[in-house]
Amino acid sequence: MLIFFQNLESQEVNGYDLVEIEGVSTVVVESESFRENRASYCKQRSNPNEVIWAEEFSSGKLDKEIWDYDVSNGFYDKGKFVYGWGNSELQYYRKGKTDQNTNENLFIENGLLKIQPIHHRRAFQKEFDYTSARIKTRNLKQFTYPSKITFCFKAPTGTGAWPAFWLMPEENIAWPQGGEIDIMEAKGRLTNIAGSAIHFGEGFHNKDEIVQNVVIPPSVRFQEKFHSITMEWREDSIQIFLDSESKPYMTVKSDDEVFSKFSYPFNRNYYLIINVAVGGKYDDHRINRTAFCLNSKCSNKDNPDDHRFLIDWIEYARLEP
């Protein structure tokens, strides 16, 4: 589904038009670079002297010293298992099982990390119709401020696909007291919209969030071209940028009014998570079963990569305070 924004009533923020699409505040980005037909609109890489760590996916192996897998369809909270990861998600996340530390749902090919949800005709473990992959750097690689985190990606198409690139606190702390930073998440149903969000508060039923989407022209949609999203992270502030844009489409500061009720939790160490969920609350449980791969080769699709979350590179670099 394409969203056309030319005739939407708008306001302005940071020089961008601000509209509301499906009830969500959405920044309209019409970059000069979009006038050129490119395979990738990702920003230029940082000066090597500024780079703390980078992931190029240049070998076929997922580095076990950096990446670990989440496995299952949920988690334990106070001794009780929470199915669907708290979001009514349908997929079962599988572990790496080869010498390459990959599996049918996650592999590295041609310098790209590829994550593909698979719809199983016979339920996986007799219970789950979908499998996928979710990797994390917890206890292996930490991220903190002042820094900038950038990743270059192409989103998967298909209603029900939910790719995400996000941060959670390294310490053991009840969600969302330590905060959650969703640098990028997208709905497979919406081809030219991606979003960012932060979550914070005292508990599951006593919390708040800030959500900001970004919409781009149909000619450069997130599901057909590579784009980058960068989070610039300083003490007491977060700014998020699309591609090579000099202005952020999302800005959060500790003195924003929303933090008068809940404390600002984002001055701490976090770990990185990359995953593709299936279904769930994010797109109101919408799902199109025919949109998904049916096997590891995705042989039921003419262009398998269209149905995979593709990541070209990740960069973690120094930033002046």
Give the ranges of each region predicted by the language model.
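Classical Sec-dependent N-terminal signal peptides that target proteins to the secretory pathway
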Residues: M1-S10
